[in-house]
C-alpha cells in the first residue's frame, strides 16, 4: 500500500502537467486501483481511529488525479446518454451482483464509480459522488446528495433534498462526516468538513458549514464545525453585540441518548423543543 501511496503523491505534485493523452501507465494503473478499492469499501478517505477521524489525504489526491487522467466518454443511461470522465458504479451490474451486495437502488438514482454502498442501504432517486462511503442500513432519500468523499455512518437517514458537501469543488481539507444513527431533516445542508456526531437529529432546513455558529442553549457554548453527539438541532438566530441585528445560527435545543431515541420517535424529539 505504501508503494501505491508514493506513486499517487508523486503524480499529484505534477498534476497540472497530466492529461489523458500523456498520463503514464504506472500512474494510471495506481489511480484506477485506488478508485476500485474505494468502490469496494476496502479503502475509505476518512476513518475513525482511536476515537478520532483521520483523513487519508493521498486517497483524496487519487480521486482528484482520476479527473486528470480520464477523458470524457459517453455513458449510457435508461433515460438519456451522458458525457463524463467517471463511469457509473452500476454500469456492469446484473441481478446477481445486486443481490450479492444487498442494497436497493430506485431509478433514477446515480452513483459514481469509486463510491462505496454498504448492505441494506436504500438509495431513492438521489446522487452519490466519487469517493463517498455510505454505511449499512442507511436511507438516502429522494433528491438527497452525498458529496465527493463524504462519510455516512450506519443507520443514517438523509431526508429528501439533503445536501452533504464534498471535498473536490470547492477543494476542502477534510470530508463532511455524518456518524452512525443520525437523522438529517429535509433540505438541510451539512458542508465544509463538518462532523455530525453519533445519534444527532438535525431538523428540516438547517444549514451548517465551518463558520456556522452552533449554539447550545442549555450551556451557552458555541461550537464550530462539529455537532456534539446526541444533539437535537434546529435553525435559529443569535443577536449581534449591539443588538441591532441578528445572524443565522444552528441551535442545539436538547441532548438525547440512545435509550431516549429508542423510545421516542424523531418527530416527537423535534416537536417538543420548548
UniProtKB/Swiss-Prot annotation:
It is found in: Cytoplasm. Pathway: Amino-acid biosynthesis; L-lysine biosynthesis via DAP pathway; LL-2,6-diaminopimelate from (S)-tetrahydrodipicolinate (succinylase route): step 1/3. GO terms for molecular function: 2,3,4,5-tetrahydropyridine-2,6-dicarboxylate N-succinyltransferase activity; nucleotidyltransferase activity. InterPro entries: DapD_Trfase_Hexpep_rpt_fam, Hexapep, Hexapep_transf_CS, THP_succinylTrfase_dom1, THP_succinylTrfase_N_sf, Trimer_LpxA-like_sf. This is 2,3,4,5-tetrahydropyridine-2,6-dicarboxylate N-succinyltransferase. One of its GO terms (biological process) is diaminopimelate biosynthetic process. It is an enzyme of class 2 (transferase). HAMAP family: DapD. The lineage of its organism: Bacteria, Pseudomonadati, Pseudomonadota, Gammaproteobacteria, Enterobacterales. PANTHER family: 2,3,4,5-TETRAHYDROPYRIDINE-2,6-DICARBOXYLATE N-SUCCINYLTRANSFERASE, MOLYBDENUM COFACTOR GUANYLYLTRANSFERASE. It catalyses: (S)-2,3,4,5-tetrahydrodipicolinate + succinyl-CoA + H2O = (S)-2-succinylamino-6-oxoheptanedioate + CoA. Substrate binds at residues 104, 141. Homotrimer. It comes from the Bacteria. Keywords: Acyltransferase, Amino-acid biosynthesis, Cytoplasm, Diaminopimelate biosynthesis, Lysine biosynthesis, Repeat, Transferase. Its EC number is 2.3.1.117. One of its GO terms (cellular component) is cytoplasm. Its main location: cytoplasm. Belongs to the transferase hexapeptide repeat family.
Amino acid at each position: 500500500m505504501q508503494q501505491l501511496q508514493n506513486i499517487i503523491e508523486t503524480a499529484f505534485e505534477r498534476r497540472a502537467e497530466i492529461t489523458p493523452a500523456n498520463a503514464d501507465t504506472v500512474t494510471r494503473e495506481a489511480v484506477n486501483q485506488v478508485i476500485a478499492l474505494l468502490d469496494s469499501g476496502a479503502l475509505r478517505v476518512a476513518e475513525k481511529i482511536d476515537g478520532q477521524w483521520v483523513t487519508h489525504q493521498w486517497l483524496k489526491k487519487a480521486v482528484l488525479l482520476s479527473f486528470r487522467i480520464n477523458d470524457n466518454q459517453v455513458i449510457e443511461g435508461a433515460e438519456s446518454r451522458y458525457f463524463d470522465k467517471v463511469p457509473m458504479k452500476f454500469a456492469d451490474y446484473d441481478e446477481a451482483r445486486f443481490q450479492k451486495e444487498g442494497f436497493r437502488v430506485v431509478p433514477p438514482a446515480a452513483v459514481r464509480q469509486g463510491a462505496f454502498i454498504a448492505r441494506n442501504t436504500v438509495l431513492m432517486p438521489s446522487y452519490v459522488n466519487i469517493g463517498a462511503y455510505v454505511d449499512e442500513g442507511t436511507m438516502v432519500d429522494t433528491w438527497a446528495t452525498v458529496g465527493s468523499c463524504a462519510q455516512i455512518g450506519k443507520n443514517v437517514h438523509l431526508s429528501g433534498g439533503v445536501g452533504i458537501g464534498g471535498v473536490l469543488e470547492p477543494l476542502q481539507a477534510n470530508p463532511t462526516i455524518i456518524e452512525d444513527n443520525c437523522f438529517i431533516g429535509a433540505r438541510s445542508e451539512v458542508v465544509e468538513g463538518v462532523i455530525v456526531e453519533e445519534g444527532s437529529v438535525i431538523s428540516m432546513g438547517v444549514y451548517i458549514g465551518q463558520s456556522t455558529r452552533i449554539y447550545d442553549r442549555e450551556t451557552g457554548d458555541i461550537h464550530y464545525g462539529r455537532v456534539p453527539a446526541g444533539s437535537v438541532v434546529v435553525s435559529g438566530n443569535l443577536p449581534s453585540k449591539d443588538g441591532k441585528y441578528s445572524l443565522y445560527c444552528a441551535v442545539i435545543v436538547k441532548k438525547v441518548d440512545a435509550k431516549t431515541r429508542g423510545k421516542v420517535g424523531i418527530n416527537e424529539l423535534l416537536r417538543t423543543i420548548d
